[in-house]
Every structure is written in C-alpha cells, then in structure tokens.
Amino acid sequence: MSEAEARPTNFIRQIIDEDLASGKHTTVHTRFPPEPNGYLHIGHAKSICLNFGIAQDYKGQCNLRFDDTNPVKEDIEYVESIKNDVEWLGFHWSGNVRYSSDYFDQLHAYAIELINKGLAYVDELTPEQIREYRGTLTQPGKNSPYRDRSVEENLALFEKMRAGGFEEGKACLRAKIDMASPFIVMRDPVLYRIKFAEHHQTGNKWCIYPMYDFTHCISDALEGITHSLCTLEFQDNRRLYDWVLDNITISVHPRQYEFSRLNLEYTVMSKRKLNLLVTDKHVEGWDDPRMPTISGLRRRGYTAASIREFCKRIGVTKQDNTIEMASLESCIREDLNENAPRAMAVIDPVKLVIENYQGEGEMVTMPNHPNKPEMGSRQVPFSGEIWIDRADFREEANKQYKRLVLGKEVRLRNAYVIKAERVEKDAEGNITTIFCTYDADTLSKDPADGRKVKGVIHWVSAAHALPVEIRLYDRLFSVPNPGAADDFLSVINPESLVIKQGFAEPSLKDAVAGKAFQFEREGYFCLDSRHSTAEKPVFNRTVGLRDTWAKVGE
C-alpha cells in the first residue's frame, strides 16, 4: 500500500479519534465479517478498505472472520476466493483467519444462559406462523402460545433440538423481548434454527445453528472488537446487538456504527440477482469481466490501487446514494494512463499496401510511455504491408476528419507519412485493400518541405502481426438503475460484450494476465486469464480512453 494514498477522514474516524483521546479505548480493533456464500463485489471493497484501512492507519488490528452460520449456502470455494480478494486489494488480517463457527460452543452456552434467565424460549410455531405473529410496521405482534414455557422445559427442548429430535422448521429458539416493540427486529427474534447440513468447518457436529444477530455481537465481543462497522440496513439490528450483550455474562461490549452501503450505476449488487445472472448464463461466471465482483473487476484489468482510490473518493457517510459508474472508470483510467505501457493493436483491420516501399522491412523505435522515458522503448517491426483500423480510412471526408482519406496524407505512429492513392473492393463494395505511397524521408520527423500532416494513426506490420481476439466489454446494463426495472434481466445491455478478431504488435505475445496496456488510440486492455492461449491471446478492454457514456446520458 502506497504511503502516498493519503489518510481520509469521515464520521467514523472522528468517533475513533474521540474514543482514543478520551481513553475509552487505547487501541483500535475492527473486523471484516463476510458470509462465505458468494463472491465479494465492489460494495464489499468499500467495507474492506474502511475496516482494514482504519486498523492500518491507527496501527491497530483487523480480523477476517467468516460469518459461517448457514451451512446450506456456504462453501469453502467462497472462503478461499474471499481471502484471495482481501489480499489482492493489499490488506492483511490480524492473526489467523477466524470463523463464527469457532465460537459455536460459547454461543450455545450463552443461549443456555438466556434460557436460564427466562430470556429465551423454544418455539414450535412454523416459520409461516412466526412471520404472521410478528405483526407489521403499523401493527404489533402477538405472543406465541409457547412463549411462557418454564425454564426447565425450554432447557429440555433446546437439548432435544441439539440432539436432532426435531425436524427442520419444527422448532427454534427465540429471544423473549417484546412482541409490541416498534422495532420488528426486537419482536422475539429467532436465535437458533435447525439445519441438518454438513458444515464446511465443523462437519456434522451440530444440527442447530445460531442466527447472524446472535452470533455477530458475541463474536465481536469475544475477539475484543472496539468498533463494529456495518452498513445502514443493520441500523435497527443494533438494538438487538446491544440487548444480547447486555443480557449475557461477557466482559466486553463493542459498539456498532453504521455507514451507507455502496450503490453503483449500471449494475446490481444483490447476491440473488448476481447469482441469477450466473446460473441463467447471462454471464460466464462470477469472474465475468462485466460483473461487479472483485474477481470480475480484476479479470477485466482493474488494479487494486484503482479500487482503493475509488473507495477513498466516494468516502464514508450515513446517507445512501448511488455512485456514477464514471467515477469508478475514472479511477482505473487515471491509474493506467499513468502506469500502463503503450502498444499497438488493430481491432477492425483492413490491409494497407505501401506500393513504393522497398525491402522486406525495418524496425522502428517506440517509447513505452510518452511521458515516462524511464519506462524505456521497444523495437516494432515495420513493412510495406500493414494493418490499420477500418475506422481510420474514408474515401471522402470533411475537414474535421484527421485520419487517412483518398488523395491525402496521414502519419503512421512513430513511422512514416503516407498518402492514400486508391482502394480495392470486394463484390459487396467493402474495401479490402488500401494502396498508398510513403515519403521515405519522414521516419519520425516532419516532411522536409515543411508541409503539415496533422493526423496520426496506429498500425501493425502484416508480416509480423500477432492474431488476437479482442473482447470489448461495456456496462452490463443499459439503464443506470437496473434494480428498479420490473425485470432487471430485460435491461441487460446487448452490446456489453462485442468480440473482435484483430492484430497486435508482436511484443504482446509476451503479455501476462493482470498486466495492463494502453492500446494506442483504443483504450486500456489486459490479457484474459481464462481464455487466452499461446496461439491466440485474448485481450479484455478494461476501459476506454474517455467516457463514451457521458454523451449517451445527455
């Protein structure tokens, strides 16, 4: 992590500063507690940067704890991917990876303590009846007929639950709080439910599993967390967080603070919707470069530094808002403009023949970065037959068109000035070859007679060209807020992936996955980690040179 990434400020850091100044805490201990039931997305990156960033800046600790209380939906695959994402973003957790399941014995003991205090009971209402009895925002709930069981009966029934004596959905343990509470979360919430499923950490030791709200606060306390940071949807849950800790015998009582979650235009963050995109094969997987997952962004070519910078720029507030996709794209564009070496690739190729060029070819010198001589230069082969992009030639054009036109001149990047003389077309009228002449005395210099040549286009020597597949990725949805659509799948952008067969300069045969290039005049690209082969490299467009959606939105 670069020291240059300046320390941000926000309301949470102000709270921490006050806590340290008052002596309430002498150190800072945070945690990042994902559930291992899916891949992390850009919204999680905000929480990662906040929790790990605070620990880093205050020289404290941040735990990575997996909230693994639902074995039905969780998998070790997600555990490993989450660990990889956190490390890739540039952060390191304190000590060993932790799991909520590490505390199942203590959690069970605390549940028994609540039963002994008359603060928890075994309920045999069905899940549907529990929802019905809970009431609404405008109507109070009503007590379960099982609410007033004795402590002894509840202890026996809870042990029966643990021993597998009830079927799933036939019994649960509930907190005994207040069914008339204005906060629905406090209307006797479920603390334990039955699930006959093998757990990826504990195997078949348990058939009862604690709920998130019971587990989360106790895990925080057992780990000595000082500041428990959650998104705003858990604001009401803070009352239950405090109630549990106030009513069990535990020496540490962390405080929960809420911040706004990250909402991003032109995508969805809901795990259910992301899963639907994958299972219905609208995308090729969780790491599809159009997905907002960290693995998808990484495969597309986003850098960890650009994501950290994005999270820093959007800040941490209590107000929900939706961030423009252009803000995220701006961060990676700035990063790669500064750091990505340049290369030439022709995405929509058409053959160009220089009729007066003599010899088999030559090498021309090109800088790897126009503003960074320390990045060096490379030798690129040039010959009398080259590929140029079809969009860089017109038979006729107005003065605003600064590329190649019949009868006019243009410069080939770091090479010669050429003039278009004639074209050859196929039976359908498509141009197949452009025939040109060149000025042999203009290699990387102006014409001797002083004539001005304004346009510059890129090229690839046909004899040396590397055949490449180029995947032009764009925004996955065609509207800014796809989640608001009646059917979010109906607003998938049909142009979110366009595949082209093109040619690249031969140096790109040594490209490695994860290393970005600016394809001159085209955008920023990286080698695809999944589909590339030695015979046929595949390059993903990370982002264009400029925001082409700005005009679309106007």
Swiss-Prot record:
Keywords assigned: Aminoacyl-tRNA synthetase, ATP-binding, Cytoplasm, Ligase, Nucleotide-binding, Protein biosynthesis
GO molecular function terms noted in the UniProt entry: ATP binding; glutamine-tRNA ligase activity
Keyword Signal: no
EC number: 6.1.1.18
Residues the record lists as binding ATP: 35-37, 41-47, 231, 261-262, 269-271
Signal peptide interval: none
Alphabetized InterPro entries for the sequence: aa-tRNA-synth_I_CS, Gln-tRNA-synth, Gln/Glu-tRNA_Ligase, Gln_tRNA_ligase_bac, Glu/Gln-tRNA-synth, Glu/Gln-tRNA-synth_Ib_cat-dom, Glu/Gln-tRNA-synth_Ib_codon-bd, Glu_tRNA_lig_a-bdl
Binding site for L-glutamine: 67, 212
One Pfam family, short name: tRNA-synt_1c_C2
Catalysed reaction, written as an equation: tRNA(Gln) + L-glutamine + ATP = L-glutaminyl-tRNA(Gln) + AMP + diphosphate
Positions occupied by motif 'KMSKS' region: 268-272
NCBIfam families, per the entry: glnS, PRK14703.1
Protein name: Glutamine--tRNA ligase
Gene: glnS
